[in-house]
């Protein structure tokens, strides 16, 4: 095994898995099975180890097997520092428990231990969904490159909740405006760090998105993310104060910035075809991987790449182009329902009703 690979995972009461122990190899790991058997659940569990949660839900309850109170994911990660043991306990009634090598850890510790990128049917929301999907895409990249930024985002969220609570209290009774000014100033300071981080990222990200789009589509095109944010947040809050007090909510800041994606200068969300939208979404994910590969300080050398039932949504040309990009990575995990796919695999696994079996095939 080489750097940053998952060699083993144990699942207990995760989704439809009661208990399952699964080993992986480097190269291409193919996971076959009919719909509803647990392929996506397995992909989700692997991605969960990267510190960015589930790509399907923000809630813990759906992750826990029906009738149980807790789910567990544990894994062995092969890194340049040797084998790292990662554990995540997922609970209905309390915060998740995170451990690295047996020691209590934070999310940023997971980000530094295991890097993983997942391609899934939900990726179409990067193009067709609301701006929140694209904001999260940018913010996840920022936190991957600089795990300490997780603290900035957490502080921003806490400050936002405090400010919203204060705004609501204005509606019920007269509160001191200087207290609102204090929370506003704190929100502006944290928000500015996020806005500037996004601007720096877009400068290096957009050329990559255009390059990958042109490669996947087979035609020269310009694709770019465009972020509309306030140039002076403190002035914006002054203008919005009366309205914010009336509505009891913060109406400006990076959590509300409009992030749009343009294809040849046209808004892709409303004007791109299904094929163009998928190509854009894939280009965004491939650009993320390229950035991670360039950040040798953290990712040495490749992230683990998961393709969860993505090929089923692509035509043969785009499928071939995507395969050329990702099958050369150190470790790729592909789920599929198609038994006719003839990939050169290091390992083929079959999933049936929450049980995983090895076909012991070598490509």
UniProtKB/Swiss-Prot annotation:
Source species taxonomy: Bacteria, Bacillati, Actinomycetota, Actinomycetes, Micrococcales
Which GO molecular function terms does the record list? ATP binding; single-stranded DNA binding
InterPro entries given in the database record: DNA-binding_RecF, DNA-binding_RecF_CS, P-loop_NTPase, RecF/RecN/SMC_N, RecF_2
- Which organism is the protein's source? Tropheryma whipplei (strain Twist)
Cross-referenced SUPFAM superfamilies: P-loop containing nucleoside triphosphate hydrolases
Superkingdom classification of source: Bacteria
Query: What keywords are assigned to this protein?
Result: ATP-binding, Cytoplasm, DNA damage, DNA repair, DNA replication, DNA-binding, Nucleotide-binding, SOS response
Which compartments is it annotated to reside in? Cytoplasm
The family classification in the record reads:
Belongs to the RecF family.
Q: Which GO terms describe its biological process?
A: DNA replication; DNA synthesis involved in DNA repair; double-strand break repair; SOS response
Protein name as catalogued: DNA replication and repair protein RecF
Task: Kindly list the GO CC terms recorded for this protein.
Answer: cytoplasm
The principal location of this protein is cytoplasm
Q: Does the keyword Magnesium apply?
A: no
- Which Gene3D superfamilies is this protein grouped with? P-loop containing nucleotide triphosphate hydrolases, RecF/RecN/SMC, N-terminal domain
Q: Where does ATP bind?
A: 33-40
Q: Which gene encodes it?
A: recF
Instruction: Sum up the protein's function in the record's words.
Output: The RecF protein is involved in DNA metabolism; it is required for DNA replication and normal SOS inducibility. RecF binds preferentially to single-stranded, linear DNA. It also seems to bind ATP.
List the HAMAP family hit by this protein, alphabetically. RecF
